[in-house]
Amino acid sequence: MSTKIITQGGHEALKKELDYLWREHRPDITQKVAWAASLGDRSENADYQYNKKLLREIDRRVRYLRKRLEDMRVVQYSPEQEGRVFFGAWVEIENEAGDLKKFRVVGYDEIYGRNDYISIDSPMARALLKKEVGDEVLVNTPEGEKLWFVNSIVYER
């Protein structure tokens, strides 16, 4: 089960998506379904079948977003977090080969479509929690344990 926390920006993005789906996208698709249904035989009507399927997907996403937004807690930045990795931190790490990775530790619902976000529930984020700049971090991966060094920690305020 995913942790039910989210950043303020993530919360606003989900609310914006919900608003778009409910107020703009769904009415548009509903209108298309009604138009396609008016053409007659629905069993061989590709427009009707496609848009009806799309309407079900929109409704499923709307239900999911409403439930998640109701259940989630927005985590605000606190000055006490400074200097350590906690939820919402931008972290830069480096391995022994000199490979760099930079990402933000966020909630599960915020990671999709973003290569620079990782879930607080991921093994990397769990290993990094409470670490400071200069600390070594041992992360369990499918290929075995990997060693990383924390280069920087920054918070958006």
UniProtKB/Swiss-Prot annotation:
Lineage: superkingdom: Bacteria
Keywords: Coiled coil, DNA-binding, Transcription, Transcription regulation
Molecular function via GO: DNA binding; RNA polymerase binding
Protein name: Transcription elongation factor GreB
Organism in which the protein naturally occurs: Pseudomonas syringae pv. tomato (strain ATCC BAA-871 / DC3000)
Family from the record: Belongs to the GreA/GreB family. GreB subfamily.
Gene Ontology biological process terms, A to Z: DNA-templated transcription elongation; regulation of DNA-templated transcription elongation
Statement: the UniProt record of this protein carries the keyword Transcription: yes
Job of this protein: Necessary for efficient RNA polymerase transcription elongation past template-encoded arresting sites. The arresting sites in DNA have the property of trapping a certain fraction of elongating RNA polymerases that pass through, resulting in locked ternary complexes. Cleavage of the nascent transcript by cleavage factors such as GreA or GreB allows the resumption of elongation from the new 3'terminus. GreB releases sequences of up to 9 nucleotides in length.
Pfam families reported in the protein's UniProt record: GreA_GreB, GreA_GreB_N
SUPFAM superfamilies xref list: FKBP-like, GreA transcript cleavage protein, N-terminal domain
Keyword Iron-sulfur: no
Coiled-coil features, chain-numbered ranges: 52-73
